[in-house]
Amino acid sequence: LEFFRRRGAMLVLLFILLHKIGDTLANLTFRLLFDDMGYSNDEIAIYDIGIGFWAYLIGIFIGGILYARIGMKRSVLLSLILMGVSNLSFAALAALGKSNWGMAGAIGFENFASGIGGVTVVAYFSALCDLRFTAAQYALISAAASIVGRFLTGTTAGGLIEQFGYVDFYLFTTLAAMPGIALFWLMMRAGLIDASVGTAATDRTAQPPE
């Protein structure tokens, strides 16, 4: 209840619900795309582990640097944009056809963006917590962030692919990420990010955007 007494709390909750829609939809279909394009299980494993894993680790490292250098708000906004735009790489792969370089680029970019977001967005969610109720509030925030994803299944994504095709589907997932990005930007401009953070936020995260 303490969270909902903060200014802008309902908009923050709406952002938590919306911010992963595009990313979740896209992630449900990567294996289906790779199978339909003719990649073998061994090829998928090589790209996913050999490139995706390391790209994710690099993204985590860069995310930490961005958070420290440009602050919470701008680093979160940048990570949201990167995660949304990363879906375009799979639209390009689907349009290009089977390509080793295309596969490497798409998986690398997606995992790199996810690594950055894994640092900055989690840090933002942590900053929303009151130190008196950190465990309970973070658990509720994490649960809220996954609610929409529970309604988005492989069947849902598969139906959209059948209707639109892969290229248009990944363009759609990029558009689906836009409401979360726009909402966070509007909250930044209105000062609601600062107003909604809890006592777990640091002095750096409480500074207004430059």
Where are these regions (language model features)?
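A late C-terminal transmembrane helix in Major Facilitator Superfamily
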Residues: L128, R132-Q163
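Short amphipathic helix-loop junctions that connect adjacent transmembrane helices
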Residues: L28-A45
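A membrane-interface helix-boundary motif in multi-pass transporters
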Residues: T155-P179
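Helix-to-loop junctions at the C-terminal end of transmembrane segments
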Residues: I58-S75, I161-E162
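Juxtamembrane intracellular "pre-TM" segments in multi-pass secondary transporters
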Residues: L1-V12
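Intrinsic disorder in cytosolic terminal tails and internal cytosolic loops
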Residues: M187-E210
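C-terminal ends and interior cores of transmembrane alpha-helices
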Residues: I81-K98
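Intracellular juxtamembrane helix-capping segments at the cytosolic ends
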Residues: G115-D130, L140
